[in-house]
Amino acid sequence: MYIGTQLSGDKLEQVGDRYLRQLAQLGIVHVCVDPVGSPYDWTRDILARHMDRIQTAGLVLDMVQLPLSSAGIDKVRSPGIILGQEPDRERELDGICHLIEMLGSLGIKAAKYNFNILGIPRTPSERGRGGAVLSTYRADQVLDAGSVTRAGQVSADQMWERITYFLERVVPVAEASKVRLAC
């Protein structure tokens, strides 16, 4: 069985290296764990030190998150790409392409991204078996379907144009760098 995990750099700083060692003790080998800070600020040296940290814990860094997370438009680090707004979109795309090239040069084989405006809607957490805190979604508690984000009303055609623009810029760089993209 293939078991992996994912962790943001901020969360890694909270849980520390002990958590990484526990993952290895549980038999987890492949992880998606980001370095601390904005992906736009990561350097080759930061990524190399991060890989060493992961390997020291007995793990393999399989992928990192591009600065297009599932956080939603108000928290995502690349709003220009999601909103299709120039000149921010070009600057953000240049940064992502540079990041992918660095990943490839270090042998990090994959990068993941999310391309959405809403993020992942959730309602308040609930308790589950053994007192576990559960991420929860209750449709009857979600905001009106008519409410909008700062993106305003976005048609399917507009969203597909933005996705296509992103992919046309990023996929050739990923292919040349031998980095797989995961969405």
Predicted regions located by residue number:
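N-terminal substrate-binding region of glycoside hydrolase catalytic domains
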Residues: 25-44, 62, 67-87
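Catalytic domains of carbohydrate-active enzymes, especially glycoside hydrolases
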Residues: 15-36, 53-57, 102-111
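Acidic-and-aromatic substrate-binding clefts and catalytic sites of carbohydrate-active enzymes
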Residues: 5-18, 34-47, 90, 118-121
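Charged/polar interaction segments and conserved charged motifs
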Residues: 1-27, 160-161, 166
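Short coil-to-beta-strand
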Residues: 26, 54-67, 139-143, 179
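Active-site acidic/histidine proton-transfer and metal-coordination neighborhood
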Residues: 13-17, 80-183
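Aromatic-lined substrate-binding rim segments of carbohydrate-active enzymes
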Residues: 41-59, 63-64, 98
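Hydrophobic faces of well-ordered beta-strands that scaffold small-molecule active sites
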Residues: 1-7, 29-33, 61-66, 111-113, ...
